[in-house]
Amino acid sequence: MSKVTFKITLTSDPKLPFRVINVTEDTPFTAVLRFACEQFNVPWQTSAIITNDGIGINPAQTSGNIFLKNGSDLRLIPRDRVGGL
């Protein structure tokens, strides 16, 4: 099985920390979202992943589909920070 690599950046932190995650193509993207959130200590239930262009990603897909459609460079947004000042 082929693997895909995602670079996920935490946008709510001014230092913009990131994690590189390698998973198989058939891994559900919800698992990638949950793992990334655990790495950044943010709640996965209220977080979203977007592209660098600001387009939201539906996590109910395989990691391979997300990689093909959106590439490897993604951003994590804890939803409690969305729209806040």
From Swiss-Prot:
Crosslink site: Glycyl lysine isopeptide (Lys-Gly) (interchain with G-Cter in UFM1): K69
Propeptide feature ranges: 84-85
InterPro entries in the cross-refs: Ubiquitin-like_domsf (IPR029071), UFM1 (IPR005375)
Organism lineage string: Eukaryota, Amoebozoa, Evosea, Eumycetozoa, Dictyostelia
Family membership: Belongs to the UFM1 family.
The organism of origin for this protein: Dictyostelium discoideum (Social amoeba)
Gene Ontology cellular component terms for the protein in this record: cytoplasm; nucleus
Compartments where located: Nucleus; Cytoplasm
PANTHER family from the UniProt entry: UBIQUITIN-FOLD MODIFIER 1
Protein name per its UniProtKB record: Ubiquitin-fold modifier 1
Keyword Ubl conjugation: yes
Keywords, in A-Z order: Cytoplasm, Isopeptide bond, Nucleus, Ubl conjugation, Ubl conjugation pathway
